[in-house]
């Protein structure tokens, strides 16, 4: 288990597998999951010649539990800081669910020449119900859900 500390002082857990000179894949988990989600895929990717990095989002898994910075843009910043910390180049980002949303936020915030490809899986186009997306959380719009907050 390894950690790096973000610029807002959160310890993020990560693991780095394979040969450091190989093309890196960062596997990014979904909401309430940990890097354990990816353990079944690591050996296959490493045997195929990739360097594989897994990590836990802040307040997930073995990363520090905090009550701040729990936004997609902050998670994207954490991802950027991990890439910078490991001095990665030519990175492939693979995200599941909230991990896919983290990648989308990352792409919105950074024009990063270090990312060569992105793969997203199982991420809805929006969290809430809208006129063009009827499958939002609990079948509610943001306005309808705000009544409960």
Task: Kindly give the residue locations of the regions a language model identified.
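N-terminal cap/lid segment of alpha/beta-hydrolase-fold proteins
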Residues: 1-12
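Long, low-complexity, intrinsically disordered N-terminal extensions of eukaryotic proteins, enriched
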Residues: 1-2, 147-149
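Active-site loop/oxyanion-hole signature of alpha/beta-hydrolase fold enzymes
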Residues: 7, 47, 54-94, 98, ...
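Conserved HGGG/HGGXW glycine-rich cap/lid loop of the alpha/beta-hydrolase fold
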Residues: 10-65
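A generic local structural motif
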Residues: 11-14, 39, 79-81, 104-106
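Structural signature of beta-strand start/N-cap positions in the alpha/beta core
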Residues: 24, 51, 89-92, 116-117
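Anionic, Ser/Thr-rich low-complexity intrinsically disordered regions
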Residues: 27-40, 59, 64, 78, ...
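Flexible "cap/lid" loop of the alpha/beta hydrolase fold
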Residues: 104-108, 114-148
């Amino acid at each position: 288990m390894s950690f790096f500390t973000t610029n807002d002082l959160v310890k993020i857990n990560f693991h780095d597998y394979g040969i450091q000179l190989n093309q890196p894949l960062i596997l990014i988990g979904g909401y309430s999951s940990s890097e354990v989600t990816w353990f079944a895929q690591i050996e296959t990717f490493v045997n195929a010649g990739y360097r594989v990095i897994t990590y836990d989002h802040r307040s997930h898994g073995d990363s520090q539990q905090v009550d701040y910075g729990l936004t997609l843009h902050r998670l994207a910043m954490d991802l950027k800081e991990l890439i910078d910390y490991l001095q990665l180049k030519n990175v492939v980002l693979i995200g599941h669910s909230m991990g896919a949303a983290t990648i989308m936020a990352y792409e919105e915030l950074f024009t990063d020449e270090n990312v060569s490809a992105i793969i997203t899986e199982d991420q809805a186009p929006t969290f809430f119900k809208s006129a063009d997306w009827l499958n939002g959380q609990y079948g509610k719009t943001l306005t309808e859900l705000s009544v409960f907050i």
